Design a protein with these regions (language model features):
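C-terminal non-catalytic alpha-helical accessory regions
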Residues: 367-376, 384-579
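Generic recognition of long tandem-repeat/solenoid scaffolds
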Residues: 7-11, 37, 136, 455-461, ...
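Catalytic-core regions of glycoside hydrolase
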Residues: 29-33, 57-59, 66-70, 77, ...
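Contiguous, structured surface segment used for ligand recognition
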Residues: 1-49
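Short, surface-exposed beta-strand/loop "edge" segments at domain boundaries and coil↔beta transitions
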Residues: 15-19, 62-65, 470-473, 724-730
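Extracytoplasmic
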Residues: 565-755
């Protein structure tokens, strides 16, 4: 700014001028209706990465669960420009209004095409063996099917404007597991080469890349060999997205992993495979990312839902490259918020960015809505200037969107939000002081924003909704825990005073819980804020419509009391003892709580059950205690879940109690899920055959252990899958595995001395 108050903003091209405007807007502040600029404003900058992009649109979750209105065309365009002003230069789009708008600002476009994605119903003989059995995908080894896909490609790109980039995705969904296609990676890349010829016939300047999503090691190696065989000038880049990483077990799941790369883990699992890909690629091909930073759980870089299952070769993450699997969503908040809820993860995504991006030419991130606003905005700023520190990019975001005065409070709130939504061992949700701190920070920031900004600020209202809803959930969980504690104390006293029936009746009358005044206030605040943010910009937090849950398993507690009321005195005492001292196996006994990060010291075979798909509430009854709905399992292995005990009393007799439950499956998975039963062995002696696991709501199963099995002081308990489970051809078994199939399954085990 010179003495004549003239501001000069210049760019080397049309987009450069747009970025200059973005820099100007980030530098100014508004005070009392007046624009203020720094005293000295001299900025000369250029982007660090060639490709900087994302996707724009509203999610089905927002429309169906959060009940938001549709965006207008102008609002869609505003979101595009928000990210472009932050530094984006390319957006994923189809043809039509969005394409035309992008081109009007000199922005680049990315088109997409599924190499084996059908455009409608196809003959059954053409159907691919997709990894989880989805239909509508073509087997490219069927000549007529391949010709059909080539014609689809020609029809789509002929007589239409050119995209700057075209992405061919490899899987999720798509691909084919059949023997004729193996290795599918080679079948796929040869088909993509033919499709690239078609595109270049009409649009010779379009750059082509593919993604290896859900490919296995053989697929990737076949593509490496194909690219190394001779120059493939038609291909610009290898695309890397969810399911591409051969050194992580995050969704979407790969079936095999490059265990050899873990010998020296370097900076950790995120960077191992990009480095290997770059090593294998010929120099004319680039590595381009398609990072998934839109889901807060069960996704490429998100909180894990459960500990990952073993891959097709039985491999699990090595313990020295393991930290990403220790990030779990808060076990209560995850019951309320959809995968596509409003959130921010500054620390985690900053780490991911810095682990991955040194190996690529840029990123066109995956976004499934507008709930990931901070993540996407931060990513674009880092693609422009990757040496920016985390505090710098967070502070810049808060100044840009909330104003200079409110920024410090909002920056603290962003860090707290990420911490609050993560499970913290030993600190359950009611003890998380950050919930109230976050709410207070965002509330205090509101009045510090310029009035004209605050009146129209949908984004602050989204952060405030999150605070009110999290506080409501915290209070609800605390209320339920207090009820459980009250009942446990009452039953404990009754057992000592021999008045159990009276205590049961009293306790059963306490289960109807109502919102406290503070809970009601939080819910009402979230409702009002949600209506305002929806009116202002078609955004609202889905959690408001999903607040009522049995968070801690009160359903089990109520059922146990009802059973005790109907039982005979001795059985009643046993049932009530579990109410007051649930895990206690008695003197000389052992308890194992199987599942993700639970103490199960006697397990020697099996691993935590991850459900094979995003967990939804319908899969298990919320009436289960947390320990009852978390399990170990095996897949198609011949050895089922196994526990081994040593140093037992050879003169004692033992019995064993299991908690069993089996999940519900979504319609697209259910037809191949025939597993219901399992058998139980003590050493090599069958003690229970074809035990049917209860559906959704767990129950207990108790058996005597033959004295012979414990006479040497050792005992092996082994589960065995039913004879008709995981049988059949290779493809059907793989689809079953990939969809969450289980052979044996168990939640808890008590080994107890008989009295």
């Amino acid at each position: 700014v010179d003495h004549q108050n003239i501001l000069l903003a210049a760019g080397v091209d049309q987009r450069g001028c747009l970025y200059a405007v973005g820099e100007f807007l980030r530098q100014i502040s508004v005070r009392n209706g007046v624009l203020e600029l720094p005293g000295q404003l001299e900025v000369r900058t250029a982007p660090a990465f060639e490709i900087r992009g994302t996707q724009v649109g509203q999610s089905d979750v927002a429309k169906n669960l959060a009940k938001v209105r549709d965006w207008t065309d102008k609002e869609t365009q505003r979101v595009i420009l928000d990210y472009a002003l932050a530094g984006a230069n390319i957006f994923s789009t189809g043809y039509g209004k969005k394409y035309d708008f992008l081109k009007s600002f000199g922005l680049m476009t990315q088109g997409e095409f599924g190499a084996n994605t059908a455009a409608g119903k196809i003959p059954e003989a053409w159907e691919a063996k997709e990894s989880i059995g989805r239909t509508g995908y073509v087997c490219l080894s069927v000549p007529e099917g391949k010709d059909y896909m080539l014609k689809l490609c020609d029809d789509y790109f002929r007589d239409r404007p050119a995209f700057d980039l075209v992405k061919f995705w490899g899987g999720d969904g798509g691909g084919c597991e059949c023997d004729k296609c193996k290795p599918y990676g080679l079948t796929f890349i040869k088909t993509v080469e033919k499709m690239a010829e078609i595109i270049h016939k009409y649009h010779p300047e379009t750059k082509i890349y593919f993604t290896n999503q859900k490919f296995d090691n053989a697929d990737d190696n076949a593509i490496f060999s194909y690219l190394q065989e001779k120059p493939r000038d038609w291909l610009w880049a290898w695309g890397y997205g969810p399911g591409s990483d051969a050194t992580s077990w995050q969704p979407g799941h790969r079936q095999t992993h490059r265990m050899d790369l873990f010998n020296y883990p370097g900076y950790g699992p995120y960077s191992l495979y990009p480095k290997e890909i770059l090593h294998q690629l010929p120099p004319q091909q680039k590595l381009l990312y398609y990072n998934e930073i839109t889901h807060w759980k069960y996704a490429q870089h998100a909180f894990i839902q459960m500990y990952p299952r073993a891959d097709r070769e039985g491999n699990l993450p090595p313990h020295w490259s393991h930290d990403i699997y220790e990030r779990r969503p808060d076990q209560f908040l995850t019951m309320v918020y959809n995968r596509l809820t409003f959130y921010a993860c500054p620390r985690n995504y900053f780490r991911v960015f810095n682990d991955l991006m040194p190996y690529g030419v840029g990123d066109i991130t995956h976004s499934s809505g507008h709930h990931d606003h901070f993540n996407q905005w931060m990513w674009q700023r880092l693609l422009w200037a990757p040496r920016t520190t985390l505090d710098e990019v967070v502070n810049e975001y808060c100044r840009t969107w909330f104003g200079k005065e409110a920024a410090p409070l909002m920056a603290k709130a962003l860090y707290l939000l990420e911490k609050n939504i993560e499970e913290q061992p030993g600190i359950p949700l009611p003890q998380k002081t950050g919930i109230s701190e976050y709410y207070d920070l965002v509330r205090r920031a509101g009045p510090l924003m310029p009035k004209q900004t605050m009146d129209q600020d949908w984004l602050w209202r989204m952060y405030m909704q999150k605070g009110a809803l999290d506080r409501y959930v915290q209070l609800s969980v605390e209320q339920q825990m207090q009820l459980q504690s009250r009942i446990e104390k009452r039953i404990s006293t009754a057992l000592k005073n021999d008045e159990s029936l009276k205590a049961i009746e009293e306790s059963l009358g306490w289960f109807e819980l109502k919102d406290t005044p503070e809970m009601a206030a939080m819910k009402e605040e979230a409702r009002v804020l949600g209506e305002e943010s929806n009116r202002l910009f078609g955004d609202r937090n889905d959690g408001y419509f999903n607040l009522q849950h049995d968070f801690i398993g009160l359903g089990w507690l109520k059922r146990q009391l009802e059973r005790a009321r109907s039982a005979r005195p001795r059985e009643r005492r046993e049932l009530l003892n579990m109410v007051v001292d649930y895990e206690n196996p008695g003197e000389g006994g052992f308890y194992d709580n199987l599942g993700t990060y639970n103490p199960a010291p006697h397990v020697v075979a099996g691993y935590p059950y991850d459900h094979g798909q995003p967990y939804v509430s319908e899969m298990m009854s919320e009436g289960n205690r947390a320990s009852q709905r978390s399990m170990h399992f095996t897949q198609n292995e011949e050895q089922g879940v196994t526990l081994h005990y040593t140093d037992l009393d050879p003169k004692a007799t033992y019995q064993i109690r299991f908690t069993f439950v089996r999940p519900w499956y979504q319609d697209r998975y259910a037809p191949r899920m025939n597993q219901k039963c399992q058998s139980i062995y003590a050493d090599d002696q069958l003690i229970a055959k074809n035990v049917e696991l209860p559906f959704k709501m767990s129950d207990f199963f108790t058996y005597d252990i033959p004295a012979k099995a414990t006479s040497d002081g050792d005992l092996t308990i082994r589960l065995e899958k039913a004879g008709d489970v995981a049988r059949g051809d290779r493809v059907s078994v793989e689809q079953w595995r990939n969809s969450g199939g289980w052979g044996t399954l168990v939640s808890e085990v008590w080994l107890m001395k008989k009295k």
